[in-house]
Amino acid sequence: GCDCSGMYGQKPGQPTWAELLFHQMEEKWQSPVCFHNTSVGGVDSEWAIENSSQRAANFHPDLVILGFGMNDRCGMEEYRNKTGRLIEAIRKVSPKTEFLLIASTLPNELAATEPHHFWAHQDEYSESLKGLEGMGVAIADIQAVQKEIGKRKRYIDITGNWLNHPNDYLARILAQVVIKTLGM
């Protein structure tokens, strides 16, 4: 949701997918929700592992939503391993925390060129996370939904920066997938 209109003061002023989720949680549960979005743009899951205590575990949260992968660009086994290490690092400090894993939304397929090769293995990440699913770990499969959308819409219709950031439309879809996965 890094390129939602609300971040730039543009109409219609839509919040990020995380803010949409937060508002839905409060509305659905009719009680205050303590929501910490400690994400940092442009980082990868190695950074998340290194910073897991201060960014997540020290809050002793009931739920952690992990959405890494866009900047990892590694193979699916390495991605699954890093995500598993991140879960373990958080559980060392906060053993009762549950997790919702989101494989990254997909970047522009045309971004597989020098110098960045931005499109790499991201389309494998949803499948790779299934090996971590189980007690206390669920998956919100935004990639399956985005792939279906891609059959009818051009990438420019769902991106805010033509490379990898969701626009208002895809951010709403992402929020809806997470909300549905959480059973709200």
Residue ranges of each PLM-predicted region?
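Active-site-proximal beta-strand/loop segments in catalytic clefts of secreted hydrolases
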Residues: 1-2, 37-41, 66-70, 102-106, ...
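Serine-esterase "nucleophile elbow" of acetyl-processing enzymes
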Residues: 1-38, 53-60
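Oxyanion-hole/transition-state-stabilizing segment in secreted/luminal serine hydrolases
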Residues: 5, 45-81, 107-108
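Short, solvent-exposed loop/turn segments at secondary-structure boundaries
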Residues: 8-13, 75-79, 112-117
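Conserved beta-strand segments of alpha/beta enzyme cores
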Residues: 34-36, 98, 136-138
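Charged helix-capping and loop-helix junction motifs
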Residues: 78-86, 118-125
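A short helix->loop->beta-strand "cap" motif at the edges of active sites that frequently abuts
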Residues: 93-99
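Catalytic His-Asp segment of secreted/periplasmic serine-dependent ester chemistry enzymes
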Residues: 105-184
